[in-house]
Amino acid sequence: MLAKRIIPCLDVRDGQVVKGVQFRNHEIIGDIVPLAKRYAEEGADELVFYDITASSDGRVVDKSWVSRVAEVIDIPFCVAGGIKSLEDAAKILSFGADKISINSPALADPTLITRLADRFGVQCIVVGIDTWYDGETGKYHVNQYTGDESRTRVTQWETLDWVEEVQKRGAGEIVLNMMNQDGVRNGYDLEQLKKVREVCHVPLIASGGAGTMEHFLEAFRDADVDGALAASVFHKQIINIGELKAYLATQGVEIRIC
């Protein structure tokens, strides 16, 4: 059995790490490189960096900090933000990133997933899915351009359908960003994760809602996700990564202990 992964997420805007609640009202957390170094030292299995306004601004992720991060950490990291071409991806990977993640650009051009997978291999290609539960319809819908609340829009895709589509096109991993839960720290949306797990045959990463160590355990035990991504509980030092992993190990979760 592969070890489960603990993945701090660093949302980047204007060269700094920020964090919002339900993808709104972002506050500045700090500088990118020191945070990345801290999480690596605490025992994170990998890091994810989202340049949250790149796609809505029509630009690619700011590459200047990617190489600086690569110099100070020795764990894998993934970069996302406005990657719309093979050239964009090649540059980011050449600066030291291990994976690239696409979200809004994949919705705009689904063939991008296949072209990237064919060029760089599926192991490098992560598809992020921003999913919102509509209480009126009882359905989960994929959203686009969520880094800028003035441009965020609901797409025609229901979440489960898009999960299946991106796998057909070559996604090697899926990060499910559950917008309703984001930043509120009351637990992952286990019901949604279970539904996605049934149709997801590549590694699945849960994102949005972690507030306690038990929330991580529930995601691994009840929804069988491969990794759990979180931000605010790590940024605000509510949970220490090393202590979290020790707790998960005592609960029978296969996890890499530092």
Curated annotation (Swiss-Prot):
Catalysed reaction(s)?
5-[(5-phospho-1-deoxy-D-ribulos-1-ylimino)methylamino]-1-(5-phospho-beta-D-ribosyl)imidazole-4-carboxamide + L-glutamine = D-erythro-1-(imidazol-4-yl)glycerol 3-phosphate + 5-amino-1-(5-phospho-beta-D-ribosyl)imidazole-4-carboxamide + L-glutamate + H(+)
Q: Which GO terms describe its biological process?
A: L-histidine biosynthetic process
Which key words tag this protein in UniProt?
A: Amino-acid biosynthesis, Cytoplasm, Histidine biosynthesis, Lyase
Which residues are annotated as active site? Answer: 11, 130
EC no. given is 4.3.2.10
The entry's localization annotation reads: Cytoplasm
User: Which top-level enzyme class is recorded in the Swiss-Prot or TrEMBL entry?
Assistant: lyase
Indicate whether Lyase appears among the record's keywords. yes
Molecular function as annotated in GO: imidazoleglycerol-phosphate synthase activity; lyase activity
Gene Ontology cellular component terms for the protein in this record: cytoplasm
Principal localization?
cytoplasm
SS bonds (residue pairs): none
Per its database record, what is this protein's job?
IGPS catalyzes the conversion of PRFAR and glutamine to IGP, AICAR and glutamate. The HisF subunit catalyzes the cyclization activity that produces IGP and AICAR from PRFAR using the ammonia provided by the HisH subunit.
The UniProt similarity line reads: Belongs to the HisA/HisF family.
Checking NCBIfam families in the record gives:
hisF
* Protein name stated in the entry: Imidazole glycerol phosphate synthase subunit HisF
Starting at the broadest rank, the lineage of the source organism is: Bacteria, Pseudomonadati, Pseudomonadota, Gammaproteobacteria, Enterobacterales
